[in-house]
């Protein structure tokens, strides 16, 4: 709703990284402390902030290697080879998870056929979005498979406004438990008021009430800096003309009890961005998995299917909680 000249020049509206949302700045349920955000579950179900995440897998073949379906006697256990075509490559538009083979590859070593087939990353899933391959004598033979994953926002995903007010999702609650106005307007997300004064992000508040006027008038607004002198007075007059409080404050009611809140709550329309920091890519844990040859200890690193090391201080925390076995 609120643009700048630079955002128009770089065609930001044609491929935005977020959506316009109704925000409320309030302390609610205690789950939006420390910059965390409370999300409206029904807004997520309607598709807000849904995104597509692409991951590409590429594999080359060298001497004595080929793309093919491995013999049943040499296959890796616990994996599904049924989605491969005769050339050893998965079918396009197939749904895959971390047990499906996407590229069948065999290698001949000392007269033995070794299975070197490729799966997608652990806990990943999605649809095969594109397949690119080269199989000629003039270049390296390769196969590239692109997987498209639908990412729905969940707890611990990160979001931010265009003014540096960033935070992770702390709680997702149904719409009927969210605060609401007398007109039935329910915010899409609730941010904490304690993150505003010390950061002095005045533009964050100005964009919210400007977006509110834009939604009432059905238009957009040029919010370029160092322009529109005294425009704040015009914005407040528009809000008053439409029977809203001039500074964007509204009377809200508790979604759990229906009681009116004792204080007014700031509400407005604002553009929020979904950031690339998603919990699906960062969460790390293991139950069973590979061990190192030398120490017989769990492997190190998320890529290897390893766990997090329990150091001295972590051990002390477990003992303080009364853990006798681990």
Q: Which residue stretches match the model-derived regions?
A:
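Long insertion/accessory domains within large nucleic-acid-processing enzymes
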Residues: 1-326
């Amino acid at each position: 709703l609120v643009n700048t000249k630079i955002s128009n020049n770089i065609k930001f509206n044609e491929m935005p990284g977020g959506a316009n949302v109704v925000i409320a700045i309030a302390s609610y349920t205690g789950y939006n402390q420390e910059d965390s955000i409370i999300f409206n579950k029904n807004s997520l179900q309607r598709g807000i902030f849904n995104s597509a995440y692409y991951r590409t897998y590429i594999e080359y073949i060298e001497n004595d290697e080929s793309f093919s379906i491995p013999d049943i006697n040499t296959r890796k256990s616990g994996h599904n080879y049924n989605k491969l075509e005769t050339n050893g490559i998965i079918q396009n538009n197939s749904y895959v998870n971390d047990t499906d083979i996407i590229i069948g590859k065999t290698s001949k070593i000392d007269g033995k056929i070794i299975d070197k087939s490729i799966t997608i990353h652990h806990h990943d899933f999605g649809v095969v979005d594109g397949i690119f391959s080269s199989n000629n004598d003039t270049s390296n033979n390769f196969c590239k498979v692109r997987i498209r994953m639908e990412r729905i926002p969940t707890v611990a995903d990160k979001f931010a406004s265009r003014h540096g007010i960033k935070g992770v999702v702390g709680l997702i609650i149904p719409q009927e438990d969210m605060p609401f106005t007398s007109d039935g307007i329910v915010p899409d997300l609730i941010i904490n008021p304690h993150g505003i004064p010390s950061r002095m992000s005045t533009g964050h508040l100005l964009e919210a009430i400007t977006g509110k006027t834009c939604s009432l008038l059905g238009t957009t607004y040029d919010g370029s800096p160092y322009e529109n002198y005294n425009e704040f007075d015009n914005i407040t007059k528009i809000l008053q003309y439409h029977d809203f409080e001039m500074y964007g404050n509204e009377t809200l009611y508790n979604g759990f009890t229906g009681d009116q809140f004792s204080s007014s709550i700031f509400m407005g329309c604002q553009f929020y961005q979904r950031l690339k920091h998603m919990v699906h890519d960062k969460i790390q844990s293991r139950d069973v998995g590979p061990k190192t040859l030398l120490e017989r200890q769990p492997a190190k690193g998320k890529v290897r299917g390893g766990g997090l090391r329990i150091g001295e201080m972590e051990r002390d925390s477990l003992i303080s909680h009364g853990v006798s076995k681990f």
